[in-house]
Amino acid sequence: MGYQKLGVNTGHRKAMLRNLVTALFRDERINTTEARAREVRSIAEKLVTDAKQGDLAARRRALAYIYEEDVVRKLFDNIAPKYAGRQGGYTRIVKAGCRRGDAAGMVILELV
């Protein structure tokens, strides 16, 4: 499956997505553009599904992607158990109008 370039080079895109995923799990909601939210949603859903296993390998994979250790701890101790009975669909995208400067479509990405 492909990915969106998001108007930046590869290193910048990867770092930006890691930052957005870290912020999503830390704050449980983020405000961003629609294209970025769709990319972050895909990554976040996979990380939550992985965290539901709760094993050491899953924790190490999460630590390799998420920047902050306390956010990984929160993902495994608080967020993943909350979705134990749910098969996917851990996030929701709500449209939030357009950005003032360039009229980019803004959304709120939040954990359900």
UniProtKB/Swiss-Prot annotation:
PROSITE patterns: RIBOSOMAL_L17. GO terms for molecular function: structural constituent of ribosome. GO terms for biological process: translation. SUPFAM superfamilies: Prokaryotic ribosomal protein L17 (SSF64263). One of its GO terms (cellular component) is cytosolic large ribosomal subunit. It comes from the Bacteria. InterPro entries: Ribosomal_bL17, Ribosomal_bL17_CS, Ribosomal_bL17_sf. Keywords: Ribonucleoprotein, Ribosomal protein. Part of the 50S ribosomal subunit. Contacts protein L32. Belongs to the bacterial ribosomal protein bL17 family. HAMAP family: Ribosomal_bL17. This is Large ribosomal subunit protein bL17. It comes from Pelotomaculum thermopropionicum (strain DSM 13744 / JCM 10971 / SI).
